[in-house]
Swiss-Prot record:
It comes from the Eukaryota. Its EC number is 3.7.1.-. Belongs to the AB hydrolase superfamily. The lineage of its organism: Eukaryota, Fungi, Dikarya, Ascomycota, Pezizomycotina. It is an enzyme of class 3 (hydrolase). It comes from Acremonium sp. Alpha/beta hydrolasee; part of the gene cluster that mediates the biosynthesis of pyrrocidines, fungal natural products containing a macrocyclic para-cyclophane connected to a decahydrofluorene ring system that show potent antibiotic activities toward Gram-negative bacteria. Within the pathway, pydG catalyzes the Knoevenagel condensation that affords the 3-pyrrolin-2-one ring, using as substrate the polyketide-tyrosyl acyl thioester product of pydA. Signal peptide: none annotated. Keywords: Hydrolase, Virulence. The gene is pydG. This is Alpha/beta hydrolase pydG.
Amino acid sequence: MFTFSSSFMFDFELTRLLGSASSGGCDVGEFKSAVGKIKKDDPESWSVAWKEQAERAQRIGDQAAKAGYRLLARNAYLRASNYFRVTPYMFSNDDARVVPLIEQSISSFKKAAVLMDGEVICVEIPYEKGITLPGYLFLPPSYARLPGKVPIVMYAAGADSTKEELYFLYGHTGPQLGYAVLCLEGPGQGLLLKKSKVPLRPDFEVVAEKIVEFLDNLSESRPTLELDTGRLAMAGAATGGYFALRAATNPRVKACISIDPFFSLWELCLSRAPKAFFKLWDSGWVPDSTFDTFTDVHGRGNFQSGWEINLGRSSMGAEKPTAMFRRFKDFTLEPAAGEVPILDKIRCAVFLTGPGAGQDMYSSAEESTFKIHRLLSNVPDSNKEVWVPTDVAEGGLTAKIGAWALLAQKTFEFLDKHFDIKRPEL
């Protein structure tokens, strides 16, 4: 398979970025210009290359806006936002450059949002302890409205995505098909993690309850939006796919789109680590100090591992690798002793996907997708679908990167079916 970089991680992220081109997140010429300046496993060259393109796209957007070119300005601002997002991507979250660059990504995106065909509402969802969850509610333009009220897709970020990046999948396509799409960041995501240091939480059903309550209140306070809170779907990819399944235990959620989820983060970790050594540590034969030293040394010698360890520690609110790995065990669909199985609580329609191109970076079809499908005992076979493509063009990579247009098509075909939406053939 062709690669853009000899670094597996860099190639994956470059494919992820280029894959947003169909929805306005990247330009091929800008992509080629940046890639030619990036050195293998060199985060500084990555950052310099993408910051150059971000600032360039921002200037183009400003020039187009000054000239009155609404469409061209919007497109340039979208690209600038996406390039600013990836500029600090290879840095650890404690790097002082990260937050200002993400804030620039947000600023560029908001400039694009006011130029979109449908209304975009910037929302702050009340969470807890005075914290709010930021998001964008993308509404269908008048020409794309369906008969009746507007169904809603709630789209949660994963471990490393942002609410701005989420636009390039469902935020772009959904409103054009008559859906309202809420792209949001929960605890441990976006600036809530990078700036406020709020970690991820495994029981995302608690977060989902806050989101549903917010939509109820918004629908009541703004009845002219005609939001259909009786037709709510929850979507997410990778870690977000796990979150979507936890959210689907809420009876208000009528459909779940779980893209390449993991069943157990700890088990996923074991599948990518020296399993025997991890088991010895987990059983107490290897002390924490030895394990932490080993992990830190390994991270310094392997860029991808070091990056993942840094992200994991910040996402889990852990100072040491041992604390991080222990917290991984909380992120599971396996029920605690004596509890009702989590997947038994799901009764809505479920669309499950898995990676199948031999590059299952952060999920496994066999250990996660198919296992979850088998354990959804209270969802009739007619209400659950599985899609595990093997070719990259079909969505074989993790989170379906490089094939988001096809993923969007399959997603909304599924939602149309279960939300009883009929469309005439063209």
